Amino acid sequence: MSKICQITGKKAMIGNNVSHSKRRTKRTFDLNLFNKKFYYVEQDCWISLSLCAAGLRIINKKGLDAALNDAVAKGYCDWKTIKVVG
């Protein structure tokens, strides 16, 4: 599974570790990413999403249906990649 939020489209970033002597080595800044199940009322099923904490706050603010429609419109996910559970 890739490290991309399905609601916000955020990805893991690449940067540098900087030591005291200012030597730089590559590192990744990972997301606060987790898998979460939601009950999708419109289709009467459970869906599983991979999202970050900001994506969860967006779902709490807008609602699941509006957040999914916005994510599909912006191209962060499509209806084929949303996993239907059980």
Curated annotation (Swiss-Prot):
Keyword vocabulary terms for this entry: Ribonucleoprotein, Ribosomal protein
Source superkingdom: Bacteria
Classification via InterPro entries: Ribosomal_bL28, Ribosomal_bL28/bL31-like_sf, Ribosomal_bL28_bact-type, Ribosomal_bL28_sf
GO MF entry, a single one: structural constituent of ribosome
Keyword Ribonucleoprotein in record: yes
Alphabetical list of SUPFAM superfamilies matching this protein: L28p-like
GO terms, biological process: translation
Keyword Repeat: no
Record-stated family: Belongs to the bacterial ribosomal protein bL28 family.
Protein name: Large ribosomal subunit protein bL28
Source organism per UniProt: Bacteroides fragilis (strain ATCC 25285 / DSM 2151 / CCUG 4856 / JCM 11019 / LMG 10263 / NCTC 9343 / Onslow / VPI 2553 / EN-2)
